[in-house]
Structures are given as structure tokens and as C-alpha cells.
Amino acid sequence: MKTLYSLRRFYHVETLFNGTLALTGRDQETTGFAWWAGNARLINLSGKLLGAHVAHAGLIVFWAGAMNLFEVAHFVPEKPMYEQGLILLPHLATLGWGVGPGGEVIDTFPYFVSGVLHLISSAVLGFGGIYHALLGPETLEESFPFFGYVWKDRNKMTTILGIHLILLGIGSFLLVFKAFYFGGIYDTWAPGGGDVRKITNFTLSPSILFGYLLKSPFGGEGWIVSVDDLEDIIGGHVWLGSICILGGIWHILTKPFAWARRALVWSGEAYLSYSLGALAVFGFIACCFVWFNNTAYPSEFYGPTGPEASQAQAFTFLVRDQRLGANVGSAQGPTGLGKYLMRSPTGEVIFGGETMRFWDLRAPWLEPLRGPNGLDLSRLKKDIQPWQERRSAEYMTHAPLGSLNSVGGVATEINAVNYVSPRSWLATSHFVLGFFLFVGHLWHAGRARAAAAGFEKGIDRDFEPVLSMTPLN
């Protein structure tokens, strides 16, 4: 098969220490990449690259299954999931498996089944990966032209894009079917403190759903992260799945327009950079969602959000001091503002103290106490239920903040209490991974553009400064 790049471009990359270490079609001389450059050696070997991707999928699914079973084996039903460092079981619980009213786990068998199914799937993928990496054809173009490709073939590339979009659309509809047909999903807003329910009346209004995209990302607006009812979330997945599937069909049936052929770089490394950029965006959005959103990520499973823990603390002390005789409506704090209650910039009654910064929090345990103008004083005096007190005290002591002292007015625990919220883990990991993916996007985009423009040189090894330096030994 014709090599798409001049091999001279790659000779600056690295020199093998062991010149005898050669795999046909995968050594430095034929590919221009040394062994440590990984899949770059397979740029023009579609069969072997397929093996690498299938094996990688097998590793991912194996982790999911093994970690799932590990969490099931360590799970203690009497403790909340977020106290046990779990990150997979909360996702399964959110999908409505094994939980009942209030997010209580009533059956762990579905979690076990999930783990075993993923392990079995990973074995199939692992076998496929090994087969295509070692035994299958090196290139697919001759034997299986439908699965073969040339990176420069714009029409084939958009067809592959279309297939991917259809698969993403099907994935989106799987959530819709789970919520609508197969038992429903967990709704933290269900009356009485959350329950599993079928989502039958989902929102399909484009003005509501696309309105989220047009909202400001700041404050109480919160862009798409501000979604707070499952009808909107499932309706959004109906729209998203439909757009992905229709877009996929469009990309399969059409060829790229002239402006797209001119504007985009059409090479393997360019596609890698586009993909990394998309994944970086996904990572940053997921970070914000798991940190701020308590509807898609219910606090019963993931622990409270930062604002939620802070508001829960203010509520807990309001309840305590009100019982001790404080007049919470008029008590003044050290700054002259209300100690327990004050007014927001737009006039609503909100909690006073440092938690004022989180006044736009919405949480299922707090909303019943609001009236048309914010917190309702008469409800705070007469209508607080024991479950609201219990939940706020629990959330107050489980803030997703890794600190030894008070942060934002929230009392965090001493170091002996070994607690890190899954929200902290998931938000931090997705931000860091998203950032690295973004750097990778910039790196590969720069290389792809340079290669397309024909000026990528690399380091000239003949005049490298280290060659003129004294040997270390």
C-alpha cells in the first residue's frame, strides 16, 4: 500500500537501541516510528490498527467489569455509597438498578450481573484484539474493502464518521429506553426523598432544551449543567440521539463539500487531534456536571455538591438554634447581615453567613421550604420534616472538599476521618484528563498542520547540543 508520508520526515524520531528487534511492517525502517511510538507504527496497517483498538476496548471493558465486581465485594449496604469510595455502583444506582425509595440499596444482584457481563464481553474483545494484532490480515483494503480505508480518502472518512455518529445515537436512545420502558431511573426529586420512576412525559420542546445551550455558564444560569429535572434530561437524549443518527446517515450518504475539503486537514494525525479535542470538551463538561449537578448525579449516591453541603450546614444550625429559642428571622450576624436568613441581590430570602454565595442552590431536601420569594419563614418555623434534618446533617458532614480547615464556611473533618467524596474524585479526574487530552489535541493538531504544509523538520540529530557534551560517566 502506498505510504502517505515521506519516510524521511520520521527519521529524526528515535534510533532503536537494538537494531535486530524488528517485526515485519512494524519496525522503524518501514514505519518511521520506533517501538515506543505505539500505534503510530500501524498508521498504514489497517488490520493491525484494528487489533490495537479492539484490544484497547477489551482493556477498558475489563476494567469496568473487574472494578464493578470489586465494588460489589466491598459494598456495605448500611453505609451510603459516597462514604465507601464507590464510583461505578452510583452510576448503576442512578440508572435505577437495585435501589428503592430514598436511594436505599435493596438488591446488589444487578450490580453483580453488570460486572460479570462486562468481564465476559472483555474476554471476547481481548480475543478479537489478539487475533487481529497477531493472526489477522495486516491490511483490510484487499480482503475486506468495506472495512479498509486510506486516510486521505475524504469520502471514506466521512462514512466512518457517520457510522460512529449512529452508534452514539443508539447509545443515547438506550438511556431513553431504560427510563421509558425498562423500569425507569432514579429521580432524586421524587416526593418524600427520591425514588425510581419511569420517565413517560419527557420534554421535547426545542425552545426549552436548546434554551439550555443559550444560557450563561455563570451563577444561577449554569448553561446545560443547570438541568434539574429528568424529563428534560431524557428529552435531551431523544433529541441528541435523533440528531446523531440523522447526522450519521447524512455523512454516510454524502461527500464532503468543497469548503470542508479545503478547510480541514485530511490525515490520520489530524483525525486524532479532532478526536482528542472532542474528548477534552467531554471531560470538561463531565467535570462541571458531576461537581454541580445533583439531578443527573444524585446526592444520595455521589454525596452532596459543594454548595449543597454548605447550605445544609446553614440549615442544620438554623434548625438547632431555632429549637433553642433563636428568632431566625431577625437575628443579626457579626457583619450586620442576617445570621440565619438574609436577602439575595434579587430580593429572595436566602440562608445567611458564608453560604450566601451558594444562594442559587436547588436541592430536593430544601425546595419544599421555599415560597414565591425564596425561603418561607413560616415553613421554616412549622414545616421542617425529620427526613430533611437528617439529610442536611448528613450532607453537612460529607462536603466534597479536601481540606483540614473550614472552606467556604463548611466544617470539614479532621484528617483521621478518611473521607473523600466521589464528586471530588470524578470532577478532578475528568478535569485533569480533559486537560491532558486538550494538550494532546494542540500537539497533534500542530504536527498535522505542519505535515500538511510540508515544513515539519524535527530536531536535526547531527547538530544536537548533547553530542558535543562530555559523557556522564
Curated annotation (Swiss-Prot):
GO cellular component, one term: chloroplast thylakoid membrane
Residues modified to Phosphothreonine: 15
Superkingdom per UniProt: Eukaryota
Main location: plastid
Cleavable signal peptide: none
Residues engaged in binding [CaMn4O5] cluster: 367
Positions carrying N-acetylthreonine: 15
Spans traversing the lipid bilayer: 69-93, 134-155, 178-200, 255-275, 291-312, 447-471
A biological process term (GO) from this entry: photosynthetic electron transport in photosystem II
A GO term for molecular function: chlorophyll binding
Membrane protein topology class: Multi-pass membrane protein
Propeptide: 1-14
Compartment(s) where it occurs, according to its Swiss-Prot or TrEMBL record: Plastid, Chloroplast thylakoid membrane
UniProt keyword list: Acetylation, Chlorophyll, Chloroplast, Chromophore, Manganese, Membrane, Metal-binding, Phosphoprotein, Photosynthesis, Photosystem II, Plastid, Thylakoid, Transmembrane, Transmembrane helix
Pfam family, one: PSII
InterPro entries for this protein: PS_antenna-like, PS_II_antenna-like_sf, PSII_PsbC, PSII_PsbC_sf
Homology family: Belongs to the PsbB/PsbC family. PsbC subfamily.
Described function: One of the components of the core complex of photosystem II (PSII). It binds chlorophyll and helps catalyze the primary light-induced photochemical processes of PSII. PSII is a light-driven water:plastoquinone oxidoreductase, using light energy to abstract electrons from H(2)O, generating O(2) and a proton gradient subsequently used for ATP formation.
Subunit comment: PSII is composed of 1 copy each of membrane proteins PsbA, PsbB, PsbC, PsbD, PsbE, PsbF, PsbH, PsbI, PsbJ, PsbK, PsbL, PsbM, PsbT, PsbX, PsbY, PsbZ, Psb30/Ycf12, at least 3 peripheral proteins of the oxygen-evolving complex and a large number of cofactors. It forms dimeric complexes.
Matches recorded under HAMAP family: PSII_PsbC_CP43
NCBIfam families reported for this sequence: psbC
Protein name: Photosystem II CP43 reaction center protein
Lineage, highest ranks first: Eukaryota, Viridiplantae, Streptophyta, Embryophyta, Tracheophyta
